[in-house]
Amino acid sequence: MSSGTPYIGSKISLISKAQIRYEGILYTIDTENSTVALAKVRSFGTEDRPTDRPAPPREEVYEYIIFRGSDIKDITVCEPPKASHALPQDPAIVQSSLGSAPAASYQPSVPYSPFRGMPTYSQLAATSLLSQQYAASLGLEKLGSPTASAGASSSCSSPSPQPVAPEPDVPAEPPQLSQNAGYPSIPVRKSPMVEQAVQTGPLENQAQKKVQQAKGAPVGQRGVRQSGPQSQPAPLNVPPPAAPVLGTINDENRRPPRRRSGNRRTRNRSRGQNRPTTVKENPIKFEGDFDFETANAQFNREELDKEFKDKLNFKEEKPEKEGEEKTDSGVETQNSDGNPEEDPLGPNTYYDRSKSFFDNISSEMKSRRTTWAEERKLNTETFGVSGRFLRGRSFRGGFRGGRGSAAPRRNQTTQRAGTGRV
């Protein structure tokens, strides 16, 4: 990487369009996404530059910040890259580790050595983006102990038992970078302006601190292990504990799901009445057009009339005698003993013009007729008791909406009419 771009590993001073100056080590320049990535970045604020939103300097050192190229105002190279003392490019090397070094002796060439198996900067940023939403969208991560990156509100809101300082095991980062070589190459989405990221940093830190308190794990148990030369402080692997913060924040910002029930009542419907469900019936499929000629050929009106007459057994009509009294055979009549009279037409005669004007086709026979009591009982069993019987006397809501019976009210009207006080 250093051979292709000579400024990789140099100390860069960058000024954004918000007049905020940043200093860090140039890590990568992405020409496709038009982004510039700096490592070990520190913000110096606006520094009396004219701006609508002045920002003070910050003491935090971020692991990396990805800047959008369109929001960069000026870039200056402060120091050239230092000589590289890293291992040569040997494909046989899978993992390496260096002993602890003093914090002052910073070797920028070690974490930026051109390993073949090391993923690009966009891949490392993408893995952190997937596990931490705020740090992903803002493109930044604090440098320091893992406790400072997991619950990073120590420098903003409350004092922390562990001081925020650069890691003495900075050269131990290449093993962690080589372990991340198996991540797929996921494109990094463009982050918003960095000045917004700096302002929303404490909010992320407070959310992460709440997650630690909920789990009940003390901060001291998550310290960096520096007991031997094999110590590997994984600053890039710390963001996974912040994954529960995503669900908490997303659940708070998400609308509650709407409850859908098929038995939802409406205001205009009566109590206990459910909404009718519409069932889609399958449409009838016709194979072809209707053939009228074939249907007319099958329809013979003369044969149907003959068959109808045979079933009804019509008799020849006789001339009606003048002055003959006509009796209604369809009306049930009873004698004084209560027995029904005999049918003048006979049991098998449906219509005889000489005997009666009425027929026995559409009317019920006397043997099948019911009395008014039986008919009333049948109506009650079929339709239930009528509601008009509830408005009797001594009930509220009688005739004309008055209390009690309706008879006194009629008497009052009659008396008023007699006295002329209508």
UniProtKB/Swiss-Prot annotation:
PROSITE patterns: DFDF (PS51512), FFD (PS51513), SM (PS52002), TFG (PS51536). Residues 278-314 form the DFDF domain. Pfam families: FDF (PF09532), LSM14 (PF12701). A motif (TFG box) lies at residues 367-387. Residues 309-329 have a biased composition (Basic and acidic residues). A motif (FFD box) lies at residues 349-365. GO terms for cellular component: ribonucleoprotein complex. Residues 145-159, 206-217 have a biased composition (Low complexity). Residues 145-290, 309-354, 394-422 are annotated as: Disordered. Gene3D superfamilies: 2.30.30.100. Residues 256-272 have a biased composition (Basic residues). Residues 1-81 form the Sm domain. The keyword Ribonucleoprotein applies. Keywords: Developmental protein, Ribonucleoprotein, Translation regulation. The keyword Ribonucleoprotein applies. Residues 160-174 have a biased composition (Pro residues). One of its GO terms (molecular function) is mRNA binding. One of its GO terms (biological process) is regulation of translation. Residues 411-422 have a biased composition (Polar residues). Component of a ribonucleoprotein (RNP) complex, at least composed of cpeb1, lsm14b/rap55b, ddx6/Xp54, ybx2/frgy2, pat1/P100, eif4enif1/4E-T and eif4e1b. Different translationally-repressed mRNP complexes probably exist that contain either lsm14a/rap55a or lsm14b/rap55b depending on the developmental stage. Component of a ribonucleoprotein (RNP) complex, composed at least of elavl1/elrA and/or elavl2/elrB, igf2bp3/vg1RBP, ddx6/Xp54, ybx2/frgy2, lsm14b/rap55b and, in a subset of RNP complexes, stau1/staufen. May be involved in the storage of translationally inactive mRNAs and protect them from degradation. Plays a role in control of mRNA translation. Belongs to the LSM14 family. This is Protein LSM14 homolog B-A. The lineage of its organism: Eukaryota, Metazoa, Chordata, Craniata, Vertebrata. The gene is lsm14b-a.
